[in-house]
């Protein structure tokens, strides 16, 4: 124990530096441990990068996919704006285009309309996925038509809109896929 005796007004005071020494030693030890951990992590990362580790290959692939999807966003924005302008032209003087109708796409029916706010095609959604596609058993299928009408009557509160909303919720906009009801609707009218 390191002691220092101080005399002040005939009073002897002993100052013990033992706790200060322990604190300094703890600081030195923790600093050394910190730098050893950082050095070990750096060496591990260097080893991962110099070896053909599948973790970094997967991360590289993920970054490429993420950048590609970000590029799609600008394309989808442009296409959504074009389709919205086209929808405004289609809706001029036609108020019934904003009401759900069963649209015949050949092999299936979809209950769809133009959205009043965005003027984009909108369909009744099946759960959390894409639109209800009521498959037809024959060229003329009254039961499929009837089920489509049932969807309009009872399920019209759950909808999906082509474009950015669909891209954000499902991962695709519907415009750049063929066949898809969004791109087919654009070609129908």
Curated annotation (Swiss-Prot):
Contains two intramolecular disulfide bonds. They are created by the viral disulfide bond formation pathway, a poxvirus-specific pathway that operates on the cytoplasmic side of the MV membranes. InterPro entries: Pox_LP_H2. Belongs to the orthopoxvirus OPG107 family. Keywords: Disulfide bond, Fusion of virus membrane with host cell membrane, Fusion of virus membrane with host membrane, Host endoplasmic reticulum, Host membrane, Late protein, Membrane, Signal-anchor, Transmembrane, Transmembrane helix, Viral envelope protein, Viral penetration into host cytoplasm, Virion, Virus entry into host cell. Residues 50-189 are virion surface. Residues 1-28 are intravirion. Pfam families: Pox_LP_H2. The chain crosses the membrane at residues 29-49. Envelope protein part of the entry-fusion complex responsible for the virus membrane fusion with host cell membrane during virus entry. Also plays a role in cell-cell fusion (syncytium formation). It is a single-pass type III membrane protein. This is Protein H2. Part of a stable entry-fusion complex (EFC) which is at least composed of proteins OPG143, OPG147, OPG155, OPG86, OPG94, OPG107, OPG104, and OPG099. Formation of the viral membrane is necessary for the assembly of the complex. The keyword Disulfide bond applies. One of its GO terms (biological process) is fusion of virus membrane with host plasma membrane. One of its GO terms (cellular component) is viral envelope. It is found in: Virion membrane; Host endoplasmic reticulum membrane.
